[in-house]
Structures are given as C-alpha cells and as structure tokens.
C-alpha cells in the first residue's frame, strides 16, 4: 500500500542515475508514493528538469546532487548534500554501459565501468545501508541486468560489473533478513531507454524477447522489494531467461546471447 511503502522506506529516497531512463522512472514512481527524493546524476540540466517534473506531478520535496560517481571523492559530496536527511530507500541505478568488443575498448573505459558500476554502488550501500541497519528499517534496490547471469559478447566488462551487483545484493538480502532492511537486485533485459537507444542496436535484425519498457520494469521492482532477493522484470523475459538457463548448457547459453548481440551490434 501507498502508506505502507512510505512508512517502511521513507521519508527520503536516493536515486542515482536519475537524469534519464530507468532512474527518471524510479524518481517518478517513488515520488508518486509520497517519498521525498534526492536525485543524483552527472547531467545537471536533465537532472533539474526531472526534479521539476516530479515536484509538479507529485508535490514532494526534491533535492538534486550533481556529481560524477567515478570520482574517488563522490561520497564526500553526497554526505555533505544529504546531511540531516534520513534516506530510507537507496536505488543504485547509475551505470556506465559502453558497448563494443573488449579489445576495441580503451582500458580507461573498462576501468571507468568498474568505478561507476561496482565501486560506487559498494560505497553507497556501505554508507546508506549502515544507517538503515542501525534504524532497523529501509530498502536497497541494486540495478543488475539480464546480462549478469552468463558471459555476453560486446558487453564483457559491463556484464561482469552487473554480475557483481547481482551477487552483492543477493548476499546482502540473506545477511539482512529479519533486520528490517530489504535488498533486491533487479535484472532487466534490454529496456527502451535513451541510453539503450544511444548504443545504436540494429533491433530489426533481432529475434529475442521484445524490449522492456521502463514503467512496468520500475513498478515491478518497487513491488518485489522485500519479497525476493532478485527479480527479472517482464513475464516473457523471466520465462525466456529462466527456461534457457535450465535447459541449455552454459556454453550454449553464452553462444545464444552472443549471437543476439552480434545481430544488434555486429558490423
């Protein structure tokens, strides 16, 4: 229920990567549930627009923090900006997702993925999760990906960082059972977001499950928090991935997913 969610995970939610895509949708839906919001992103003007939109549609207080999660000191900025704010819900959604063959990507790009996709979520969970644990209530949503469960050509490093988020969240789900703090890893398949469109996939060549939409993906994530350690949004995606993992040897699974990526991103 609306009130139940607010009393369990309020009064403030912090969402990273909130300036577009899934992060924006999280901001909208969490705002609609009556929680105040701290929205974090590197893109200042887009972030300001999202904040304004959510203030208008939900009437909740919205605070924005512009920072780069690949910076070693990003937490100092966040700590300063959230002083005196009780964050009861953390949505670790920001990610750096370049697509390309491993040896065609710069080392700098690959290391940045680890900074934004692994190091930053770890620090955020360590920081905000500890205070939730002390208060005996709260929620943590970590965005993983359908790519986290097997090797995926063209996003080798990215998929590996998403596996880190999946395993971290599932482990914390178990460690924190009964503590009042809920943890969930969300594993969406390809989702129709600006970020995905910017990767320029040749969608017309592909035969796999249809693209997810951000709205139902986020709604499912908010609904499943506290019910399960990890979740694949979208019934068709869930069935496809679960069945394929049960029926196919790992080698075949990697090749199947890889052939789809080659259709999308191959020359």
Positions of PLM-derived features:
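Conserved NAD(P)H cofactor-binding loop of Rossmann-fold oxidoreductase domains
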Residues: 93-99
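Substrate-binding pocket helix/loop in short-chain dehydrogenase/reductase
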Residues: 101-114
């Amino acid at each position: 229920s609306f009130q139940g969610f607010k009393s369990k995970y309020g009064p403030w939610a912090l969402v990273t990567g909130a300036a577009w895509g899934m992060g924006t949708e999280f901001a909208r839906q969490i705002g609609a549930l009556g929680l105040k919001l701290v929205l974090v992103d590197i893109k200042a003007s887009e972030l300001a627009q999202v904040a304004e939109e959510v203030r208008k549609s939900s009437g909740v207080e919205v605070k924005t923090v512009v920072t780069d999660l690949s910076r070693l000191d990003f937490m100092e900025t966040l700590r300063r900006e959230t002083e005196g704010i009780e964050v009861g819900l953390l949505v670790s959604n920001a990610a750096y997702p370049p697509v390309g063959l491993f040896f065609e990507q710069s080392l700098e790009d690959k290391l940045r993925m680890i900074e934004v996709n692994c190091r930053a979520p770890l620090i955020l969970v360590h920081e905000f999760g500890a205070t939730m644990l002390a208060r005996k209530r709260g929620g943590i949503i970590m965005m993983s990906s359908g790519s986290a469960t097997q090797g995926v050509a063209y996003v080798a490093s990215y998929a590996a960082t998403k596996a880190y988020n999946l395993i971290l969240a599932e482990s914390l789900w178990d460690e924190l059972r009964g503590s009042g703090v809920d943890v969930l890893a969300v594993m969406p398949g390809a989702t129709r977001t600006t970020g995905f469109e910017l990767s320029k996939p040749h969608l017309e060549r592909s035969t796999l499950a249809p693209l997810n939409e951000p709205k139902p993906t986020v709604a499912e994530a908010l609904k499943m928090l506290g019910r399960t350690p990890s979740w694949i949004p979208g019934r068709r995606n869930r069935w496809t991935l679960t069945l394929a993992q049960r029926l196919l040897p790992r080698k075949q699974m990697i090749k199947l997913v890889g052939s789809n990526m080659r259709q999308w991103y191959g020359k």
